[in-house]
Structure formats: structure tokens, C-alpha cells
Amino acid sequence: MGKIRQGFIKRVARELFNKYPNEFTRDFEHNKKKVQELTNVTSKKIRNRIAGYITKLVRMKEEGKIL
């Protein structure tokens, strides 16, 4: 079983995804750079987790699972 993401990671990711919907793609590396530009997160681990969740949100939106 996988780990559950912490609430603040989901909250920040959703806020970024809703505020800048056209900035993110299915590419994790691209999203990682965008998270670095758009936030003041200094931790590499937290940045990567936020970017990973945003990548998941983009994929879910494209598949029609979220609006």
C-alpha cells in the first residue's frame, strides 16, 4: 500500500492547479520547475510531492475524473 499524501501538499497543489490551470502538464519534470517558480517551497522533497500530485490532477482531469 502507498503512503497517503499530507493535507497541506494536496491543498497547495489544488490551489496552484486551480489558479494556473494552463501552466501544468502530464510531465512531472515540467511541473516540478513550475512549482519552483510559482511557490517559495525550499524543500526538494515537498516540491516534488506537490509536483507529483499536480501531475496526478492533470491526468485525472484529462481522463474526465474531475472537473
Curated annotation (Swiss-Prot):
Gene Ontology MF terms in the entry: structural constituent of ribosome
Give the species. Pyrococcus horikoshii (strain ATCC 700860 / DSM 12428 / JCM 9974 / NBRC 100139 / OT-3)
Q: What is the lineage of its organism?
A: Archaea, Methanobacteriati, Methanobacteriota, Thermococci, Thermococcales
The family assignment reads: Belongs to the eukaryotic ribosomal protein eS17 family.
GO CC, alphabetical: cytosol; ribonucleoprotein complex; ribosome
Q: Is Ribosomal protein among the key words of this record?
A: yes
User: Is this entry keyworded Ribosomal protein?
Assistant: yes
Q: Which InterPro entries match?
A: Ribosomal_eS17, Ribosomal_eS17_CS, Ribosomal_eS17_sf
Entry protein name: Small ribosomal subunit protein eS17
Instruction: From the UniProt record, report the name of the gene that encodes this protein.
Output: rps17e
Q: Which Gene3D superfamilies match?
A: Ribosomal protein S17e-like
